[in-house]
Amino acid sequence: MAIRESKAVLTFDFEEDPQALYLGHGVGVSGGAMSGRLVFTLEEIEEWRVMDAGTHLILARNDTVPDDIQEIHAADGLLTARGGLTSHAAVIAHRLGKTCVVSCTNLDCNEKEKYCEFNELKIKSGEHISIDGHEGSVYQGLTKVTETRKGAN
């Protein structure tokens, strides 16, 4: 007889229709559900850590490069438009224990102007987004996160 272990997974507990908040889908790499503020620079991360110490910060990039390691390390989550399970973003985020979604194909980041577009919808730096590092989904706004047990029979 085999005993299957259950594990706790962070999932979203939507108070409204999730389809109304849906921004896009990518490849879930690591972590579970996370809601936080969208950020683009190390300076923004440091400012939010002072202004709102308890908030999660989600770094957005079209793609990451090795020079982004400080930002990735300082942020709580990572969202990229490109990449796969073996991409720089995915490997580093997984190794650092960060919630991460890569290859969100309808995401376009303008790092210089500090905003992202999901199709026609613009999300600016400091606004809330929600990512699911297990499912790969991305949602607009701050969403309640709960712990769910998975894998038990």
Question: Model segments located where?
Answer:
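Non-catalytic, soluble scaffold/interaction modules
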Residues: M1-N153
